[in-house]
Amino acid sequence: MDATKKLEIITSLEKLPDLLQALQNNPGVFIMKLGAEWCGPCKRIEGLVKWCMDQAPANVQCAVIDVDEAIEVYGFLKTKRVVTGIPAILGYYKGNLNYVPDDVVIGSDQKQVTEFFQRCYEKVKQ
């Protein structure tokens, strides 16, 4: 596989084993955005998140997950207090096979979202 080829964005992680598989296959950083079609704050950052994900290095796997289609995963993360609402963007560094992310941003603050992606992309350069 070409090391410079960007990975396709994952759009389905419905079950907990799917999340575990994504963490096991993590090429450097796994970024998962949780949102919903009906969520106003999710829509406000949609363009920014897409742009940031388009800038992802080849060793970053991104996922955009609709919580209405991933009720098991979202419900689990919510009961474990990993997320308190949406939009939520979770960052898992390679080797983290736990459901607790290494970095997270919750809400639609564009500065916080941008800084989150910068931190994640900086991590894969190290």
Please name every model-derived segment.
Residues 35-38, 85:
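Short pre-active-site segment immediately N-terminal to redox-active cysteine/selenocysteine motifs
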Residues 10-14, 34, 46-74:
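Thiol-based oxidoreductase modules, predominantly thioredoxin-like and allied folds used
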